[in-house]
Amino acid sequence: DALAAHPHVVHTDAIGDPDTLMSELGQPGMHPEGWFYPDTYHFPKGTTDVEFLRRANAIMRERLAAEWAEREEGLPLETPYEALILASIVEKESAVASERPMIAAVFVSRLRKGMRLQTDPTVIYGMGESFDGNIRKSDLRRDTPYNTYTRGGLPPTPIALPSGESIHAVMHPAKTDALYFVSRGDGSHHFSATYEEHREAVIRYLLGGKADRYQGGN
């Protein structure tokens, strides 16, 4: 939206069609989500939107390739694109930047164990324009390609533009036994290694200490 509204950018028809845009960028057939490095860019007046996005795309591809080449051994990720997808989830889950390696570690451990990721941002992305700001139990049960409660593994595409920090966190997750996390309500999270500990954290942070309100879930 910011790019489309910028007065010094020359707008082209390619920007309105994802297939045409990605072909222009040398990635035909690729979904555009996640492929543009988020940063502050300086560019001359008269730059076309495709030229601008080509630059952001090239930086993302370079950063992703560099991080992939230096990744930790044994990650449950087959391709750089899978790492990009997971990094986009970490980006959406991490309001506190220092928690990114921990959040990445939880998801990496879940993938290793064959557990579903069960992360709300993917569900919200899959809901598209039907999301009204509230996510309900029925939304978590409604199957879409992006619902990581109903489907195992990663969603089919990134769900956001991951920062360099989130990409690095996925390639170098924290050393932890944590398999769960829950919001403390201040942007940070409580991490748990066991379901019982996670249940207690949910009751404490989300349910005001009222155990009778707990309905399960991961």
Feature roles, as predicted:
Residues 5-12, 20-218:
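Bacterial extracytoplasmic/cell-wall-associated proteins, especially those involved in peptidoglycan
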